[in-house]
Every structure is written in C-alpha cells, then in structure tokens.
C-alpha cells in the first residue's frame, strides 16, 4: 500500500508534538533543578529520606514511585508520586506540633492569651 503525501505529512506532524513535549519536560526539569539550587547529592538524599519516612506509615512500591522537582508558573515544587500497596495495620500516634501543644497545654487553659 502506497503512502500518500497527506499520510506522510500526518505521520511527520504526529511525531513532532511528542518530541516537543519530551523536550519541554526535560527543560522544565533542568530549570526546576537550577532554580532550587539543590545539588544532585542533596536531592538524592532528600528522596531517600522521604521514602523512608513514608514507608514507616504505608507500604509503598519504591520501584514505581518517583520524587521529582517540577516547575510551573515560576514556582518549583517537590512532588512525590508514591504508589501505596497497603497501609500499616498498627495505630500510629502522631505528635502535635510544638506550638499547638503550648496553646493547648493545661497551664494556658482558661487563661486569657492576651495577658
């Protein structure tokens, strides 16, 4: 079956957005890394520690997960996409933030906070 000129043009034009999209994603990753001013070693250490902390609470698929820097509208974000296999069965007590516990402490209860 012979390809028409239209088929050839359509085939060529379909590939262009895919490669342009890939190039754009790569450029955004490079820009995010540069703007964050984080070394590769520090970023790798952060990824490792984030995975360790999350793994304390849920079972995650480390091989399928990703922690990356993303830039959108001049804002850089650290994004963790971690598929959860299952949650842990034990109950976990979370600590209150230090400032919140001071506000709710028995010594300050019933007192006017402006005095």
From Swiss-Prot:
Gene Ontology biological process terms in this record: cell division; regulation of division septum assembly
Keyword Cell cycle: yes
Residue ranges of the TM segments: none
Name of the protein in its database record: Cell division topological specificity factor
Function summary: Prevents the cell division inhibition by proteins MinC and MinD at internal division sites while permitting inhibition at polar sites. This ensures cell division at the proper site by restricting the formation of a division septum at the midpoint of the long axis of the cell.
Keyword Cell division: yes
Pfam families, sorted: MinE (PF03776)
Organism the protein comes from: Prochlorococcus marinus (strain NATL2A)
Region annotation (Disordered) ranges: 89-115
Family of this protein: Belongs to the MinE family.
UniProt superkingdom: Bacteria
Classification via Gene3D superfamilies: Cell division topological specificity factor MinE
Keywords: Cell cycle, Cell division
């Amino acid at each position: 079956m012979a390809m028409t000129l239209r088929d050839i043009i359509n085939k060529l034009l379909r590939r262009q957005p895919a490669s342009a999209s890939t190039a754009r994603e790569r450029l955004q990753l490079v820009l995010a890394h540069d703007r964050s001013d984080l070394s590769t070693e520090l970023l790798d250490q952060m990824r490792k520690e984030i995975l360790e902390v999350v793994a304390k609470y849920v079972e995650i698929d480390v091989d399928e997960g990703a922690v990356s820097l993303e830039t959108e509208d001049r804002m850089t974000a650290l994004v963790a996409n971690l598929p959860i296999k299952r949650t842990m069965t034990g109950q976990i007590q979370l600590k209150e933030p230090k400032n919140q516990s001071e506000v709710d402490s028995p010594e300050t209860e019933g007192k006017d906070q402006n005095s």
